[in-house]
Amino acid sequence: MAIFGVLMPAINIPRLNLLDFIGDDHVKQHAFSQELGKAFNDTGFVMIANHGLDASRIDELYKQIQAFFSLPEESKRNYEIPGLFGQRGYTGKGREKAKDALTPDLKEFWQCGQTVLDDDPVRHDYPENIMVSELQDFNDILREVYAQLEETGKQLLRAIARYLDLSDSYFDKHVHNGNSILRALHYFPITDPDSIAPDAVRSAEHEDINLITLLIGASADGLEVLTRDGTWFPVKAQGEDIVVNVGDMLQRLTNNVLKSTTHRVVNPPRELLGTSRFSVPFFLHPKSNMDLTCLDSCIKEDNPKQYADMTAGEYLDERLREIGLKM
């Protein structure tokens, strides 16, 4: 299966090597954190190489995801659990929309979340992950990928903390056993284009809710990023890199020093509407009690405080209601 990574010559999204930060060379560590912070300030996006998942694991991941979404509709609906607000298991077609959008996105998805292995009291706050009885390999690969992307995300947050002149460990306690989500997305085929709403798209323009998002390359084109001057640019394909972008929680915390960038997934040309697109983002969330009050160091005379004080849990609840997953 051809997996699409990222290369966007029309916009400056830098490519960074994570080994530069997790190695012992302090000069490379500093350069990595500075380049990461600058990218998140300029565009909100960066490409990361050597993130811990090789091509064979990514291929296996997409193989299992395709297998799940190929199950009969009735079988998939058995894993859609009322009351979980899409945070675990299956969410069917037409259930989620972008903030302020009227028409649901043309997608279905599966989500798995945190498994707390220690005695952290937060373990009582999270629902158990749903296991697919027909596909044990699907369960296994999602757990493996979740663990790897969570570790990669923690390293990136340490680099961000350094860029912000915070302790490298600033985010550690907040994301240990955090409310992070791995989402397997299927943008399903449209066999009758005339049957969908004129404004229906695979994923309407939006910003992510969380701290940072780590996106494994998709199976087809379609992802577009909105630049600061209001121009949409496609994210094209290359290699095994992942795309990492700033979410709204990090933007709030840094008072817009690090920017959450608007993005979307557009429909393919009409002749390709009958094809699927698969994608796997990892939404790195903190624990719900993390204080998102703007950092004092990010409040300046020319950048006054932009946001009301709020916890991560309060903000997540607000956004889940806005996108239609929670009533």
Question: Where do the protein language model's features map onto the residues?
Answer:
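Peripheral, non-catalytic segments flanking oxidoreductase cores
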Residues: A2-M327
